[in-house]
């Protein structure tokens, strides 16, 4: 509904009516409209058949890799997968953040959440001895965050019309240049 009508025009009453529940049920189970938007982003990121939250299954994917190059391949795959699934809802969040302080706060929280998740990836790289000696884990997380940012996907794939395979190869080459 957010994608069809936009954030501002979508009300909790509309969402409740579509879901055939009372508005109070949404408040009790999910929370505010901002919380619903956050939940939509979570579901979009995880994908339709995700068995667990993103953080958990990504840790499993990374742990299953044998080499740094394989791990970087997992990250590159993830950035493409997540970009494809979340680009539309990320656009809604970006637009709504410009006019709604609660959504602006959500956007900041999600950016921080991605950064914290990429600290885990940086730690995995450090454990493999793949980080340059002068680079801190926080700096490595910042580099991964920057390369994997939803805005980078939007620019290269949606605006420049790069095929996802080219975008993936670009991510992989940039990360391998730093950590490979």
Task: Show which residues each predicted segment covers.
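Helix-turn-helix
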Residues: 1-35, 39
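Solvent-exposed, amphipathic alpha-helical segments
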Residues: 1-4, 57-61, 89, 143, ...
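Short helix-capping/turn signature of helix-turn-helix
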Residues: 7, 95-100
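Short loop-to-helix capping motifs
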Residues: 32, 86, 99-101, 150
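Hydrophobic alpha-helical connector segments
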Residues: 33-35, 39, 46-84, 141
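Amphipathic alpha-helical packing segments from all-alpha helical-bundle domains
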Residues: 77-94, 102-128, 138-142, 173-180
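Hydrophobic/aromatic-rich alpha-helical bundle segments in the mid-to-C-terminal region
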Residues: 126-173
